[in-house]
Amino acid sequence: MAKRGGKRTVGVPYRFHVTPGIFMNSLVPVADNSGAKLVRVIGVVGHYSKSVHRRIPGAGVGDMVVVVVREGKPELRKQIFRAIVVRQRRPYRRPDGTWVAFEDNAVVIVTPEGDPKGSEIHGPVAMEATLRWPTIANLASIVV
């Protein structure tokens, strides 16, 4: 007989389905004071790129992506980091039925464990990102 109930992963108590709005090779501004200004998405953590019909990996709010710094401090440029998507232009639907869309796309540079490299986040942060990554919620000034 099949097991009842879904699997829960440790460290990710909230996992909402968010419509992907940021894809491979997207140029995305950085919303923290880590020194990077513009990054290019080169991968999505947890997404196998050669899966369904070679589909291009996409990330939504709250997802971790692999990025390379394109503009910013010289010591950060051409370096590969991980980042969390905190805003996206693409509208997505919340479980209560409301639709959310931001004015711009934005990411926050983090360590591989998920701790932010900067000490402050500029602009609003989506609720889905703060529920999934509590350390980002501590730095967020506005949560939408």
UniProtKB/Swiss-Prot annotation:
Gene3D superfamilies: Ribosomal protein L14. One of its GO terms (molecular function) is structural constituent of ribosome. InterPro entries: Ribosomal_uL14, Ribosomal_uL14_arc, Ribosomal_uL14_CS, Ribosomal_uL14_sf. Coiled coil: none annotated. Keywords: Ribonucleoprotein, Ribosomal protein, RNA-binding, rRNA-binding. The keyword Ribosomal protein applies. GO terms for cellular component: cytosolic large ribosomal subunit. The keyword RNA-binding applies. One of its GO terms (biological process) is translation. PROSITE patterns: RIBOSOMAL_L14 (PS00049). Binds to 23S rRNA. Forms part of two intersubunit bridges in the 70S ribosome. Belongs to the universal ribosomal protein uL14 family. Part of the 50S ribosomal subunit. Forms a cluster with proteins L3 and L24e, part of which may contact the 16S rRNA in 2 intersubunit bridges. This is Large ribosomal subunit protein uL14. It comes from Pyrobaculum calidifontis (strain DSM 21063 / JCM 11548 / VA1). The gene is rpl14.
